[in-house]
Amino acid sequence: MESTEQPRNISGSMQSPRSPSSHPYLSVSVTDPVKLGNGVQAYISYRVITKTNLPEYQGPEKIVIRRYSDFVWLRDRLFEKYKGIFIPPLPEKSAVEKFRFSAEFIEMRRAALDIFVNRIALHPELQQSEDLRTFLQADEETMDRFRFQETSIFKKPADLMQMFRDVQSKVSDAVLGKEKPVEETTADYEKLKHYIFELENHLTEAQKHAYRLVKRHRELGQSLLDFGKAVKLLGACEGEPTGKAFSDLGTKSELLSIKLQKEAQQVLMNFEEPLKDYVRYVQSIKATIAERGTAFKQHCELSETTKLKEINLDKLMLTRSDKVGEAEIEYREIKAESEEATRRFERIVKRMEDEIVRFQEQKTEEMGVAFHQFAKGQARLANSVADAWRSLLPKLEASYSV
């Protein structure tokens, strides 16, 4: 299946096909899902088509094959490297094995993966990522090697040391009675957290009701189909004109059943799925908030440790201790760590300030489109249903007026 999506420039607006090189653009399409393998080893592969005029890419178009775990690799790499940025969410795996390879699930996941990678490609910082270029251009063997290295426990010894330090710190806090967590309490930060947690609740509730709407449309469609068949059989037992009227009623019910099933699919893809996507997005933002909390804690703890080291150094200098040299080295090292932790925390805060504005603008636009499509679809369905039943009235009236 050939992609028909027009290139987008890096600000996210549509690029004119007549002047593809007038502005920098990076457009990605996730297409052609194919099931590979059997049993528990089975998975879906996708063609990822990249079109760009950015000089750091290998050419104007590149096609690679990717699987879900490759998208996970990209998300994890970006989350690790771009602290403070709201990394777009991935669609979740199917919790029910029998639905893993259903046509509906595969299409929903393909669409969600397409949204995921294009959000990254359109982000002013993320679109410059070396990992994104690797994901969009590397051959399958290279991609497998990167993914394997990422999952190896020996890949990140620094992470293991950090885990050890965290455990050591928690044990020390417990012994010293300092178990109360260090938390940021500024008014802006509290306002942000309140907004995100409230937004998650409201989106989750809206998505739950959208799911019920899809279910209701499908059930009503099935009921109309069953009713149409039953009325046709009933009409076959009747003479004219009643039999013909019943047959027309059954046919019309079956046609309306098809319309309801189609509308159910539209509500699912264009309304429920965008709501579900934004629930995942908010959960991704909560992960960034947690990272900010960790950075703030490190900033505070290292700042406190630096003060203690400075006090200890001053005492040793007063007593002319032979440990002054060693203490001075320790103080300089911990001070450098503290300053880096402060810069890291401040960078996260600044990024999040920019990100929340960007997120709200994006949410307003995308949710506005979703609600507009939903309302338009419901109006169209209501008109179709009313017209269908209205067209039957003269025939039904004639059947009992004879």
Swiss-Prot record:
It is a peripheral membrane protein. GO terms for biological process: endosome to lysosome transport; Golgi to vacuole transport; positive gravitropism; protein targeting to vacuole; root development. GO terms for molecular function: phosphatidylinositol binding. It is found in: Cytoplasm; Endosome membrane; Prevacuolar compartment membrane; Golgi apparatus, trans-Golgi network membrane. It comes from the Eukaryota. Gene3D superfamilies: Arfaptin homology (AH) domain/BAR domain, Phox-like domain. The PX domain binds phosphatidylinositol 3-phosphate which is necessary for peripheral membrane localization. The modification Phosphoserine is found at S16. Residues 160-402 form the BAR domain. Residues 24-143 form the PX domain. The keyword Cytoplasm applies. One of its GO terms (cellular component) is multivesicular body. InterPro entries: AH/BAR_dom_sf (IPR027267), PX_dom (IPR001683), PX_dom_sf (IPR036871), Vps5_C (IPR015404). Residues 11-24 have a biased composition (Low complexity). Residues 1-10 have a biased composition (Polar residues). Homodimer. Heterodimer with SNX2A or SNX2B. Component of the retromer complex which consists of VPS29 (MAG1), VPS26 (VPS26A or VPS26B), VPS35 (VPS35A or VPS35B or VPS35C), VPS5/17 (SNX1 or SNX2A or SNX2B). Interacts with BLOS1 and BLOS2. This is Sorting nexin 1. A 1,2-diacyl-sn-glycero-3-phospho-(1D-myo-inositol-3-phosphate) binds at R67, K93, R109. Residues 1-25 are annotated as: Disordered. Coiled coil: none annotated. Disruption phenotype: Shorter primary roots, fewer secondary roots and an altered root gravitropic response. Accumulation of storage protein globulin 12S in dry seeds. Keywords: Cytoplasm, Endosome, Golgi apparatus, Lipid-binding, Membrane, Phosphoprotein, Protein transport, Transport. Its main location: cytoplasm. Ubiquitously expressed. Belongs to the sorting nexin family.
